Structure formats: structure tokens, C-alpha cells
Amino acid sequence: MLGILNKVFDPTKRTLSRYEKKANEIDALKADIEKLSDEALKQKTIEFKERLEKGETVDDLLVEAFAVVREASRRVTGMFPFKVQLMGGVALHEGNIAEMKTGEGKTLTSTMPVYLNALSGKGVHVVTVNEYLASRDAEEMGKIFEFLGLTVGLNLNSLSKDEKREAYAADITYSTNNELGFDYLRDNMVLYKEQMVQRPLHFAVIDEVDSILIDEARTPLIISGQAAKSTKLYVQANAFVRTLKADQDYTYDVKTKGVQLTEEGMTKAEKAFGIENLFDVRHVALNHHIAQALKAHAAMHKDVDYVVEDGQVVIVDSFTGRLMKGRRYSDGLHQAIEAKEGLEIQNESMTLATITFQNYFRMYEKLAGMTGTAKTEEEEFRNIYNMQVVTIPTNKPIARDDRPDLIYRTMEGKFKAVAEDVAQRYMVGQPVLVGTVAVETSELISRLLKNKGIPHQVLNAKNHEREAQIIEDAGQKGAVTIATNMAGRGTDIKLGEGVKELGGLAVIGTERHESRRIDNQLRGRSGRQGDPGITQFYLSMEDELMKRFGAERTMAMLDRFGMDDSTPIQSKMVSRAVESSQKRVEGNNFDARKQLLQYDDVLRQQREVIYKQRFEVIDSDNLRSIVENMIKASLERAVASYTPKEDLPEEWNLDGLVELVNANFLDEGGVEKSDIFGKEPEEITELIYDRIKTKYDEKEERYGSEQMREFEKVIVLREVDTKWMDHIDAMDQLRQGIHLRAYAQTNPLREYQMEGFAMFENMIAAIEDDVAKFVMKAEIENNLEREEVIQGQTTAHQPKEGDEEKQAKKKPVRKAVDIGRNDPCYCGSGKKYKNCCGRTE
């Protein structure tokens, strides 16, 4: 009965049968399309575009367009998409995620919806995780599109602005997620409209969509300049932390990675730094530096969380095992690690622009994705991106043998067993892929195999340049490859001659990842396109994940049975416990990403407002009306603050108002107290505003309209950019401290939204006030030029594969005066440096 109900109510089955129907319709056109000459096939593109102009939709063209691409693919590449690939293509066109197993031809599948959506002329972005894959796919699949008369662009990190603009102007653009995000941010920092490179975001197809929209979701892309801060405290805090003893002076929680000073540790800190109370407001910075130094020593491990390369601390991505060059830990943690490793400490940077992948990709009109593993994250894709996950059946049934986990008592026993298993398979020539979770594990297994005299390749964050080549060779007879996590995604492991007879590729997992998806990716490397294969995970009671669900009890049970370290157990109960532990961790990670998105949405709304207004500024030929509105708003606020409604008119501070108006808008004597005495606030505003407009007209007559228009743009852009930059910084500080509100029985998110909104309103008011003041009071120089508010921008993000020499991080240009942005200004005005001389330097 339940089976019948499932068939009736399972939406996936209904969706698949609908896709199958479409695939059959496309397949039915095969014979007709085959008869067309190359010229007639190319002509179809022009015909489709004309039909779209006459009012047909892309949905109306789907069946014919897919059939045309299918035939073009056969003629150009020799590959003819299977029916299941047609179904995957329909899923992508509908803005869903096509879950297709490894080796099922995802790249070819994407060509059909990409072509169909590119016919509108609005541009389609095909997104991959690294530049190697973007270049490869643009080269291989681009031939199909060019054969059909569409243009193809490849957007790389090394391109100039003109080359990028050309790449984005193409019908189809191949790029990495990082480059798309950074180009968007850079476009919203340009000073002239002609410098922008992107078009409005229309349709994107993301390859390895789970990696980009889930694993990378919390990673903000940041463009930054540098703030001058002393590095001395990092060195002092590091020297102090080295003297502390674990458990006695500080506590460390493995699960949360939380590090805390004990009472004894606090007393030691106070003695070491010669202060009375570590938590005195004056010692906030010291407290912060000690906390970060402590985290660097206790929670961050070399060759697991980061590696040291060429005198730089480089983060290791815990999901992909790749090095993330150019990306830095925030909040001073990176500097603390540099101090720990005895490296040169680099200054903290000032954020100029930032966005997360979650928010960038949600700006597209339509978004689709493909991957081999997405079903476990179905809820997240549905809730956050409004995308359904559709599991596309394989072209041939899966013949892989997924064996139950083997569980050992200790790590030592487990690794010995792994080395033994690899040795036995190597003896008969069966290729083996060993998957590890950390760089140090891959190096440990490498040592064990060396001792046994087994030649092998190690693929981890330290040598990803040769990644694709190593992975391609991993299916050859006698090949042994050790890979950290899923390095090498996007490259197929094809079986060499005689390997099928040996049982195909053997995949050995050395521990379970906290995400089932990563485990499934590792399994999926074997048994592609119906090939034979075997997968086996080796676990130990000392593994990170096993500790989380109470491995102590199981250890005690094994001791009672007198089990030694060389005998594994195959227990369904333990395997189920591991899976439920993974589900719990996945749930926690989803909640964390969802919460981050709620916080990030506050900044997203503000960013959209600022970027929209900023674009209007650079797009407009005449800003005078916008500037006049700003002046009026600023004036209304000034009048309201000096003539409060709750006070009697005789209590109003008219002297103060006259002084402010003459200082900020008019000149000495521009308005007298007698002019406004006895008038209502509205009348006062009108009178003063009329005089301001007269002065504005005189100024325009003096300098000429053309120079005045450029002057307005210079002022508005500078004020918007400076204030927005400070605002991002302030919002970040607010975000860091807001969780403390939970202790005060308030909802931190609600507080963040309310305070963030108030701060945003204050920022807009500050922009209006300063624009009004500068436009009315500043004199125009002859060499009028728009200029960036901070020189020396750098981008913090992942490296571009195989592009190391281009990766040399540009050191931002520092201002000549070595003074912090929030320090008192050196001119003696009493204002903060950033609000005084720092504004013009």
C-alpha cells in the first residue's frame, strides 16, 4: 500500500516522467535534424532568434533547440547526448539542480539549456570551481556553440578590463565563481560607467553546484585596502601564550574549537603585561590579541588548517583540501598565526566591498546547477535558492560494490590495515584511490606505502598544479593515488586497459567526513558509466566523527570482548550511529548557513540600495536635482534640530542655526537671525533653501555647467564610497559583538536588523550633509578628477588553479601618514583622522 502511495505522491517521480516525455519528443526529431546540412543547422539559430522576437518563449523552442544542439554536438565533438542527458538538460532549463552521477556527462548536458537561454541575447554564465575547468569547457564545448553561430567568452583572473568586457559581451561566458563575484564588486566601485564589465545577471549554470552554493556559501568575497595598525601586540601576545599550559591556564573544546583562559591564565596575563584587570575597557585590544594568539596555538594546526609556503600562511580548505591563496582569516587570527610561525606579520585590511556567494548568485534571474551529490542537501537548496534537486537516472545501472565500514580500535590499527589492503590490490595491478580528510593523513599513508615499496602519487593542497593529470592517470593498471578530500573534482577517472577484469577502481576512504555528501563524492569516483568498482571505508574509534557520538562506550565494549587492534568489526549499529552523527552535523551546518544568510540579508538590502544609487550617479549626465535633494534633506534636518517641536519658539536656538547655515551652506552674513525670527520651521527652510539655490546658480555661472556636473559627481562618489566603506566596517563590528545580546534576553538578529537600519540611515544622512557642505563651500580646481577613496586594493579569495606566478599578492599602497583611521587627527582638530584630514588624503 505504502509503495502505491509513494508512486502517486512522490514529486520526483512525477517530475522525471515529465522530463522523460520531453526527452522522447526531442528524440523523435532526431531523423529530421540529422538530414539538415551544416548550413541549415546553423540557420536554425537565426530562425529561433526571430521566433523569440515575434513573441514565442524559450519554453516553446525547447524541444527543437535541444535537438539542434544534440546533432551539432555529434558533428563537432562526436558525442551524442543520451536520453538521460536530455532529461538533465530540461531540469537545468527549469532552474533546478540536476544530480547526475560521476561520468554521466554533466558538461555535455549543460550545452542544451545554455544554448537555449543564450538565444535571448542577454548572456548566459557557465560557472566552474577553477580556471582549468573553465578553460577546458570553454574550449571543448565552445566549439558546439560557435558552430551554431553563438559567441563564447572565457573570463579569467589575468584579463584586462577590456578583455573582460568582451568576454561578458559574448552570448555564453565561462568563468569561475570567484571571478564573477569580484567583477560584480569591482563594477560597483568604478568611477566611470564605461569601466564596468558585466551585463545584468540573466542565467547561470553552476557546475559542482554543491561545492559553490553550500561548501563556499559562508565565504565572503572581500576587496580590501589596508588600515595601519601596530603588529607589536601580536608578537607580545604570542610570546605570552607560549608560556601557558593546557587545562591549567586555558581550556580547549574540540567540538566547538573554543579556547578560553582560566582564572589562573587571566592572573598570569595580568602579571605578564603589568596590568590590574585584563577586562578593563582600556585593555580591549590586548584581550582580543591574547584570545586570537590562544586560538592560533590551540585550535589551528599546521598542515591541517593551514600550511606555510614561501613565508606565507596559506589556508587549507577543509572541504576540498585545496590551498586558498590570497584568502586570510579575519579579525586578526591570520596575524596571530603569522606570529606563532615566526613569519612577517601583515597588516589587517580595510574592507572596501564584500558579498557572499549566497547573495551573489541569488541576484540572477534564473539559476541552475549540476553535481553528482546534492540530494542530502535538498532542503537547503529549496529553502535558500528555491531550486529543486532532481536525481537523473544513470544511463547504465551502477555496478559498483559499496562495502560496509570496517571499524578498528585505534588509528594505528586502521592505517596499517589500509596500507595492507592497498599492497594486496597493487600486487594484482588493481588501481587504488585512497581518500583522506587532511593533508597530514595523506602524508602518513604515503610514508606507510613507501615503507612497503609501493610507488604512488600524492594529491593534496601542496601540489594541486598537477591535479588533473594525476586524477586522469588514477584508473591505469597498478596506479595508486592518495587524494585529500575531493581534490580533482570535475576530472574523470577513466579505467585503463585490463582494469575492468581486475574489478575496476578500488576507492578506500580513511575516515568519514562530517558531510555524507563528501563521502558520496569519494565513492562516486569509482564505477562510472556502469564500470565495475569497489568502495571501502576504514574507521577507527579515535576518528574525529566517532568521538562525537560517544566512541568511549564502544571502546569499553570492545575491551570487554578482548578485541585486539588488528581485528576490525563490521557493525551496522556503529555505521548507523556514524550516519546519524553526520546528519546532526549537516543540520548544524545548515542552521549556521541559514543564520548567516539572515544576518547577511541586512547588508544585502543596504548594498543593493547603495549600488543602485551609485550606478545612477555614474550613469546620469546631470546630478544637480539629486544634489539639490540632498541639500534640502540636510537643511531640513538642521532646521528641525534647532527648532524642536516640543520647545516654544522663544526657546529655539536661532543663533546656532544661523551659524551652521552660514558655515555649511552660505557665506558669512548669508542669512541673519532677523531674517528667520518669528517664522515657522517650514518657512525658515524655504527661505534658506531659496538663498542656497541662488548661490548654486551663481557658482554654476562662474564655473560653467560642464565643470559643475563633473564636480558634483566627484563629490558624491567620494562621499558615498568613503561612508559606505566605514559602514561595512561598522556593520562587521556590530555583527561580531551582537551575539552577546542573547545574554540580555534579546533576539540578536532583531537587534542587528534594527541597529543596522539605524546605522544605515545615519550613513545616508552623513552622505547628504557632507555632499551639501562640499558642493556649496568647496572651490573647484582645474585638475578636477574622480579618484578612488583608497588606493592599493586587494582581493581575498581562492587561488586560480595552475596560475601561481600570477598569484603574487599585491601589497596595498599605504598612506604616507602612519596613523589609524579611528585615531585623533594629527592636525589637532579633535576629530577622528578618518573624519578629518584622512578624508582627503
Curated annotation (Swiss-Prot):
<feature type="binding site">
    <location>
        <position position="836"/>
    </location>
    <ligand>
        <name>Zn(2+)</name>
    </ligand>
</feature>
<dbReference type="GO" id="GO:0031522">
    <property type="term" value="C:cell envelope Sec protein transport complex"/>
</dbReference>
<keyword id="KW-0547">Nucleotide-binding</keyword>
<keyword id="KW-0653">Protein transport</keyword>
<dbReference type="GO" id="GO:0005524">
    <property type="term" value="F:ATP binding"/>
</dbReference>
<dbReference type="InterPro" id="IPR011115">
    <property type="entry name" value="SecA_DEAD"/>
</dbReference>
<dbReference type="InterPro" id="IPR044722">
    <property type="entry name" value="SecA_SF2_C"/>
</dbReference>
<dbReference type="InterPro" id="IPR014018">
    <property type="entry name" value="SecA_motor_DEAD"/>
</dbReference>
<dbReference type="Pfam" id="PF02810">
    <property type="entry name" value="SEC-C"/>
</dbReference>
<keyword id="KW-0811">Translocation</keyword>
<keyword id="KW-0067">ATP-binding</keyword>
<keyword id="KW-1278">Translocase</keyword>
<dbReference type="InterPro" id="IPR036670">
    <property type="entry name" value="SecA_X-link_sf"/>
</dbReference>
<comment type="subunit">
    <text>Monomer and homodimer. Part of the essential Sec protein translocation apparatus which comprises SecA, SecYEG and auxiliary proteins SecDF. Other proteins may also be involved.</text>
</comment>
<feature type="binding site">
    <location>
        <position position="85"/>
    </location>
    <ligand>
        <name>ATP</name>
    </ligand>
</feature>
<keyword id="KW-1003">Cell membrane</keyword>
<comment type="similarity">
    <text>Belongs to the SecA family.</text>
</comment>
<dbReference type="GO" id="GO:0008564">
    <property type="term" value="F:protein-exporting ATPase activity"/>
</dbReference>
<dbReference type="Pfam" id="PF07516">
    <property type="entry name" value="SecA_SW"/>
</dbReference>
<dbReference type="GO" id="GO:0043952">
    <property type="term" value="P:protein transport by the Sec complex"/>
</dbReference>
<dbReference type="InterPro" id="IPR014001">
    <property type="entry name" value="Helicase_ATP-bd"/>
</dbReference>
<feature type="region of interest" description="Disordered">
    <location>
        <begin position="790"/>
        <end position="814"/>
    </location>
</feature>
<comment type="function">
    <text>Part of the Sec protein translocase complex. Interacts with the SecYEG preprotein conducting channel. Has a central role in coupling the hydrolysis of ATP to the transfer of proteins into and across the cell membrane, serving as an ATP-driven molecular motor driving the stepwise translocation of polypeptide chains across the membrane.</text>
</comment>
<feature type="compositionally biased region" description="Basic and acidic residues">
    <location>
        <begin position="798"/>
        <end position="807"/>
    </location>
</feature>
<dbReference type="InterPro" id="IPR011116">
    <property type="entry name" value="SecA_Wing/Scaffold"/>
</dbReference>
<keyword id="KW-0479">Metal-binding</keyword>
<dbReference type="Pfam" id="PF21090">
    <property type="entry name" value="P-loop_SecA"/>
</dbReference>
<keyword id="KW-0813">Transport</keyword>
<dbReference type="InterPro" id="IPR011130">
    <property type="entry name" value="SecA_preprotein_X-link_dom"/>
</dbReference>
<dbReference type="GO" id="GO:0046872">
    <property type="term" value="F:metal ion binding"/>
</dbReference>
<keyword id="KW-0472">Membrane</keyword>
<dbReference type="Pfam" id="PF07517">
    <property type="entry name" value="SecA_DEAD"/>
</dbReference>
<dbReference type="InterPro" id="IPR020937">
    <property type="entry name" value="SecA_CS"/>
</dbReference>
<dbReference type="GO" id="GO:0017038">
    <property type="term" value="P:protein import"/>
</dbReference>
<dbReference type="GO" id="GO:0006605">
    <property type="term" value="P:protein targeting"/>
</dbReference>
<feature type="binding site">
    <location>
        <begin position="103"/>
        <end position="107"/>
    </location>
    <ligand>
        <name>ATP</name>
    </ligand>
</feature>
<feature type="binding site">
    <location>
        <position position="837"/>
    </location>
    <ligand>
        <name>Zn(2+)</name>
    </ligand>
</feature>
<dbReference type="GO" id="GO:0065002">
    <property type="term" value="P:intracellular protein transmembrane transport"/>
</dbReference>
<protein>
    <recommendedName>
        <fullName>Protein translocase subunit SecA</fullName>
        <ecNumber>7.4.2.8</ecNumber>
    </recommendedName>
</protein>
<keyword id="KW-0862">Zinc</keyword>
<dbReference type="Pfam" id="PF01043">
    <property type="entry name" value="SecA_PP_bind"/>
</dbReference>
<dbReference type="InterPro" id="IPR000185">
    <property type="entry name" value="SecA"/>
</dbReference>
